[in-house]
Amino acid sequence: MSYPLEEVNKRRTFAIISHPDAGKTTITEKVLLYGNAIQTAGSVKGKGSAAHAKSDWMEMEKQRGISITTSVMQFPYNNCLVNLLDTPGHEDFSEDTYRTLTAVDSCLMVIDSAKGVEERTIKLMEVTRLRDTPIITFMNKLDRDIRDPMELLDEVENVLKIRCAPITWPIGCGKLFKGVYHLAKNETYLYQSGQGSTIQAVRVVKGLNNPELDVAVGDDLAQQLRDELELVQGASNEFEQDAFIKGELTPVFFGTALGNFGVDHFLDGLTQWAPKPQSRQADTRTVESAEEKFSGFVFKIQANMDPKHRDRVAFMRVVSGKYEKGMKLKHVRIGKDVVISDALTFMAGDRAHAEEAYAGDIIGLHNHGTIQIGDTFTQGETLKFTGIPNFAPELFRRIRLKDPLKQKQLLKGLVQLSEEGAVQVFRPLLNNDLIVGAVGVLQFDVVVLRLKTEYNVEAIYENVNVATARWVECADGKKFEEFKRKNEQNLALDGGDNLTYIAPTMVNLNLAQERYPDVVFYKTREH
């Protein structure tokens, strides 16, 4: 069988990054709608309503109306197969989000046009920089009053340090929003609000100086558009494929996801310009997506995707080759061969058994505790994919039991949740405390909820005097022993038994780093 490269070349795997409430979940819905993957897009507003958005599905997400876990959706568009990885947009779910960004080939950045660049977007962009991921930008919420579009582009360029190439340009906004002009095609698409799952047929006016344009949008807005475009074409960047692929330039689209307008414009851009599945660095060599032999890595583990089955699913990005049902793969970390007969493909929460999957696809493996984040699977070769990071937590709590007899279940639950990346656990060397570290407050709630529902353990938190944590290593054994002896009260083991320095204050950490220049304090570590 020759390896069908056309299957790989059809794949586009991307994630959406945004600040909470910029409209990411709505965009996810509408993308699926345009990809015919769902018939009714559940707009995400009514938190108490029965129609929950398709990609939000764990219990707590249903209650809070936020996407906590990363789901994966696949849909066809423009002769491509698009894999969309939905990343948690809420303040608190960053570590999972960060890791998901290691499994995609491009990102869609969604910006609320009334607000501009916000703090979470800045953080997520920093993570995409680790791999120079190509970025497409969608300026959302044009059906509301927005900031000046030129100002928005300037802000993206100055704050996020990426050049902007506008592809479409808005005509009016809020109640006066009339549509967008496509710079490359010299066409105006007139806005008619489509709600829910109604996609309106779009009226197109050809040419910027077409008198029909003045009739359609009014003389004032037509003239304003021509004036603005003169400025834009003088001041902004042309789209360059090369610079886009290197992550130096972003094509910018304007629209309103809620009004079903503009979503197809950026999807056209994504399928036309975004890279097909890319090669990936492993510890021994670079693995190309065109290789025939299968390889893939686990970037996320999620518990209880199926309330009916108490199970965990490991999400694996296929890097090369083809997955076929029943194939034998080597689980490199433990050196064992496993037969994978029941991998899953996803349409957020609806599971289907995968018969086959190609480079760029995401498949789910049933996990009974043997798979960890960062694990590599191959068809026999011993290699490990790199670049799946653990991030030092920023928030810490001591966790203890209401019923002290369940200490064993608590530890088991915490270690499993830490392998899954839901939280990090630290066990100080000098006492029996259990310290939980997270990148956001909401993770603490999730852990208590899941300990209760999955492990039947009732736990409560107490404040703990920890400001930050760093993984520590030292090449000089003698100096490391001295460091460990003198700092025992600040040392702990994490869920994977890695030595960690737990600092009560940032000042304490800085002093320790000055005092022990041979010890390396890591803010991130490879899984």
UniProtKB/Swiss-Prot annotation:
This is Peptide chain release factor 3. The keyword Cytoplasm applies. GO terms for cellular component: cytosol. GTP binds at residues 18-25, 86-90, 140-143. It comes from the Bacteria. GO terms for molecular function: GTP binding; GTPase activity; guanosine tetraphosphate binding; translation release factor activity, codon nonspecific; translation release factor activity, codon specific. One of its GO terms (biological process) is regulation of translational termination.
